Amino acid sequence: MAKIKDDCIELELTPRRYQELDDDPFILSVFELLENKKAVVRDFSAVLLESEYKVLISGIETMIKGNQDSISLETIEPFLFLSIDQENGNYRIKIKIIFDDYKESKSNSNLFEINCNEEKLESFVTALKLNLENTKNPSKLP
């Protein structure tokens, strides 16, 4: 599981598959966001495109190499905007989550920020890359 956190906010993003259709571009995922160790979002059925993972991974790797100052990603399920900015060797991850309130026919959004150093970001992207590779050959359930 790929986790990154600072003193207040923790993000976990883990691609997983129990069965795979070869032509299915979606990856069932775990998306969890904690604030002060309390769940803000805990979605065990998040669905992200494989291309979204690849854009995120390659963008972070490019930032770490110093060839890019920022990246952004917008996902559908859950509906969120994720951006990472780099300044003076420090990284700021912004996560904006859109919540739909079907009872009142409106949307609410919350913005969360994680501040980290290069080592934490590199650990996150390494774990995310490994998790994505492991979805290609999922373990068989009994």
From Swiss-Prot:
Function (record text): Immunity protein component of a toxin-immunity protein module, which functions as a cellular contact-dependent growth inhibition (CDI) system. Neutralizes the tRNase activity of cognate toxin WapA upon expression in E.coli. Does not inhibit WapA from other strains of B.subtilis. The WapA C-terminus cannot be expressed on its own in E.coli, however it can be cloned in the presence of its cognate immunity protein gene. Cell contact is necessary for growth inhibition. Unlike the LXG toxin-immunity modules, WapAI mediates competition under shaking culture conditions.
Induction entry: Constitutively and highly expressed on solid and in liquid medium, with or without biofilm formation by 12 hours of culture. Repressed by DegU.
Organism: Bacillus subtilis (strain 168)
InterPro entries: WapI
A UniProt-annotated Pfam family: WapI
Highest rank taxon of the organism: Bacteria
Disruption phenotype: A double wapA-wapI deletion strain is growth inhibited when cocultured with wild-type cells. When wapI is reintroduced it restores growth in a cognate toxin-dependent fashion. Growth inhibition by wild-type cells is strongest on LB medium and less effective on media that promote biofilm formation (MSgg and 2xSGG).
Protein name per its UniProtKB record: Immunity protein WapI
Gene that encodes it: wapI
